[in-house]
Amino acid sequence: MINGGENMLRFIEYPKCSTCRKAKAELERLGLEFEAVDIVNETPSKEEILTWIENSDLSLKSFFNTSGFKYRELGLKDKLSGLSIEEAADLLAADGMLIKRPILEKDGKILQIGYRTEYATLDL
């Protein structure tokens, strides 16, 4: 793991999350250089989140940690379909724990959200 510039993979994580730790270990095992970003201490900005949403074909729901306490506390299951992209980005930028993780990102484009598919299959 290193801090890098352009064309660098960014691994956005919650370090206490076991899934994030497993995904990070795979990146290290693959020998890939990446910048690790703590989603709580360095929550992505609204602008960054909007870029992700606009540059992906993922559903808005894909960006939310639907199993998290904050998601349930805010009742987002019933509200999400009525939110605009701007409103969703505001919510996500306000609390990193609402964001699905880990996120593997490069040049403002999401390569993968979550860790259901091993990174080795992504042709990184």
Predicted regions and their residues:
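Local sequence-structure signature of Cys/Sec-based thiol-disulfide redox active-site neighborhoods
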Residues: G5-L30, F34-I39
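Thiol/selenol-based redox catalytic cores and closely related redox-interacting motifs
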Residues: N41-L124
